[in-house]
Amino acid sequence: NIKGQNRGLLMARQNAFNAGSLVQVSEGGLSEINNVLIRLRELGVQAASDNIGDEERSFLDQEVQQLVSEADRIAKTTRFGSKKLLDGSGEELEFHVGPFGDDDNIIRYKMNADATASKLGIDGVSVAEKGDARSLLGTVDEALVELGKMRADFGAVQSRLNTTTSNLDIQYENLSAAYSRIRDADIAKESADLASAQVLQQAAVSVMAQANQTPAQALRLLS
């Protein structure tokens, strides 16, 4: 049934769109954590220099600790509905992006992105001492690399979903056109059948009228 298949395509497209929204939420969380890491690196560079004293360095360390806590909070609270996206929970998601029930209509994605402070290795960083500040730089650089891998993974999924959505749009347009042609053909056939029936009905009426006229003409001749 073309109409039923088309309705399925519309819902599949909505599923693909929602899946894309989930990925965008994940990417948004990673982007904020990336900003935190960049700021941590700035503070590390600043604290590693003798341009500032111990007191100023302690103030910088307070900001560092707050930033680490915020990055960890973002990772643990970024959700799409009830699904946690950046805490490494590893839940496998299934996106049904086709009008049929077989596996070819499903995109599976395992949510293994873990951007928590402990996973990124930034949970114990400090800039209270110059040595700690210099160590922080290497730690943050490694964290940025790991974060980049996660963002690349989400980007690949987003690209696939975009392709899927475009393909669903094309299928929907083609099926809609086919359904319209079939419907027009059915209407044309019904119109032709109706016209044919009307012609037959008119012919039958004409024959009956002629049949009724014949006896009357005979009686007139006899009289």
Per-region residue spans from a language model:
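Primary detection of the long, small/polar-rich alpha-helical "axial" segments characteristic
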Residues: N1-S223
